[in-house]
Swiss-Prot record:
It is a multi-pass membrane protein. It comes from Halalkalibacterium halodurans (strain ATCC BAA-125 / DSM 18197 / FERM 7344 / JCM 9153 / C-125) (Bacillus halodurans). Keywords: Cell membrane, Cytochrome c-type biogenesis, Membrane, Sporulation, Transmembrane, Transmembrane helix. This is Cytochrome c-type biogenesis protein CcdA. Belongs to the DsbD family. GO terms for biological process: cytochrome complex assembly; sporulation resulting in formation of a cellular spore. Its main location: membrane. It comes from the Bacteria. The chain crosses the membrane at residues 6-26, 55-75, 85-105, 134-154, 167-187, 208-228.
Length: 238
């Protein structure tokens, strides 16, 4: 029975990738992997950096789901009790990142990596990706609520808190695999992507617009509303 439950949690994570407010964010995810490494209208991120950022993004949203698995603990209650605040903070940060990509604002802290070093500090890139994954997950939870809710019920029936957290970890790994595969394919296609260098300013601004829109929706709480609506009309039933 335990093995069946674990496999259900894993499959639910994979299926959640197809939900209507996770899958459409893949382009933004790709922009996050390389977006800040555009110098002189050329992509300068290497394969190792892209994969590291992908792992950071995965670690960020995995942390959220593990906290949910520990909902009976202080950390879980703190997150649930202040989820709206987390969404608003996340909305502000994502909006700032988007404005930076659009060229509307120029924040020295975000530009210092490119200006001071030939290659960005990998630790800083990893930390930024963890933060973005953490913030996006706060907005995802309403959309994947049906699937996640079922997993939380199973986790609540677990014998121990650690069993519940383990189940949410397996769910996160199911969701993480498609994201990592996308990053792997993206990193292996860099030589082709670089042929689009002349279009990078437009692509970068377009990605920035999407991030600003997501940030505003998160801050106003409309992301959750739209996500809940899309979840109802989703043909996959997830």
């Amino acid at each position: 029975m335990v093995e069946v439950t674990i496999w259900l949690a894993f499959f639910a994570g994979v299926v959640s990738f197809l939900s209507p407010c996770v899958f459409p964010l893949v382009p933004v995810y790709l922009a996050q992997l390389t977006g800040t490494q555009i110098s002189g209208n050329e992509i300068t991120a290497d394969r190792k950096l892209i994969l590291m950022r992908s792992l950071g993004f995965i670690l960020g949203f995995t942390s959220i789901f593990i906290f949910l698995g520990a909902s009976s603990t202080f950390i879980g209650q703190l997150f649930w009790g202040n989820r709206q605040l987390f969404e608003q903070i996340g909305g502000i940060i994502i909006t700032v990142f988007g404005l930076q990509m659009m060229g509307v604002i120029s924040i020295r802290m975000l530009l210092s990596e490119k200006r001071l070093q030939a290659k960005p500090r990998q630790s800083a890139s990893f930390a930024n990706s963890v933060l973005i994954g953490f913030l996006f997950a706060t907005g995802w939870t309403p959309c994947i609520g049906l699937v996640l809710g079922a997993i939380l019920v199973l986790a609540g029936d677990a014998n121990t808190m650690w069993s519940g957290m383990s189940m949410l970890f397996v769910y996160s790994m199911g969701l993480a695999i498609p994201f990592f595969l996308v990053a792997l394919l993206w990193s292996r296609s860099l030589h082709k992507v670089r042929k689009l260098n002349k279009w990078l300013p437009t692509i970068q601004k377009g990605s920035g617009v999407v991030m600003v829109a997501l940030g505003v929706l998160l801050f106003t709480g409309q992301f959750s509303t739209i996500a809940a609506y899309l979840a109802r009309i989703n043909p996959f039933g997830i």
